[in-house]
Amino acid sequence: MNKKIIIFLLALSMIAYIEVKSDDGLKIKVLNETELTDMLRGSCIQSTRSCDANPSIKLIKEAIKSGKKFKMISVDDFPNDGIVVAVQGIGGGGPWEHVIERTKSQGLEVLPDSERNNMVVDLISDFLGKEVTAIIRSEAAEATATALLVAAERNIPILDAGITGRAVPEVQQSIPWISGIASIPTAIISPWGDEIIIKHAIDEYRVEDISRAIAVASGGDAVITMTPMNGDQIKYAALKNNLSDAIKYGKVTREAVESDKDPIDALVSASSGFLLFNGLVIKSDENGDRGFNWIDVELSGTGDFSGSTYKIFVKNENIIGWLDGELDAMSPDYIYNLDPNTGQSINSNAGFGSYPIGKEVAIIGVPSAYQWRSKMGIELMGPKHFGFEFDFVPIEELQAN
């Protein structure tokens, strides 16, 4: 055989070995920088709100340079006796300003996010008396980088799955809870290192109430670890391949831009979604209250949508959309707000869900996972949960009309 061919085949085998390794008999994929960048941009798309992937990408690249390995394991390959937990920040719109001022005057040290993220996993692990063997993404957006960094720091994989598939405004809004698995025990760390365990709660709504109140009383910021699950449970209570989908979204939009194609068209095709609107932001009335960002958004149509208006109700995330006063999309289906030139989530550099005035935005609607469309899923994330009187209508039906 030709020596060049032999060398080429050897090189291919080495690449395959680098991409898929076996740790303790487990099939684990080592993610490269391109896959990680695509994942983080795709996660911002999945978030259903404004999201800037660049800070997360910077953190991941710095970690790679320092020698960190980012590993991913599929739900099917994860052992039944393994333990996964979700890690994320929890915010609080309308934080207690007097607490912020007092802690500054006291000179209390604000712990780095990376330290708190690991502290909160240690806290839940100690409480459970079991080692955490993988991290599952709690929600899309910045929580993806959090999960990746915690997993890499602990030299464990991230699960190719999620407990929401999107970003959600409230803790109880999760696929495990729909599947009968509670988020408790839940561990919380404040910016200054206060440690809180929610051992028991009446229901998931109380977990949301308590953890959100801690965030509001902590300058609008806390870190939470929740929803411990074993390998048996994740097989029915997690969204499989959720991170692979994020990689796909990031990849198709990137490649479309690189080849001078329309990234929005590429994403609509990849997500089996619908282009709902193109327009400029002419109104964004924002109010931080009870731990959330509440926003009324209005867009003025451009291009094929000239002469039309689009209104969006936001509670941290995009919840309801109206085209010219008619219902057009609603939670739990996904409403993405994207830059039409890049296909990436718009970047507001402001509060959760913010829309910069004058920004050009493409709105895409995507059918949600089947779990969200169950009776309980609609109770948790449907329009009536957010105070509206109408029933949930799937986006396919709304667009057919």
For each feature predicted by the language model, list its residue ranges.
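A short, small-residue-rich loop immediately preceding and capping a beta-strand
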Residues: S43-T48, K130-E139, I158-L159
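A structural-propensity feature for long, helix-poor, extended segments
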Residues: N80-E101, Q173-I214
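Oxyanion-binding "anion nests"
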Residues: K248-G301
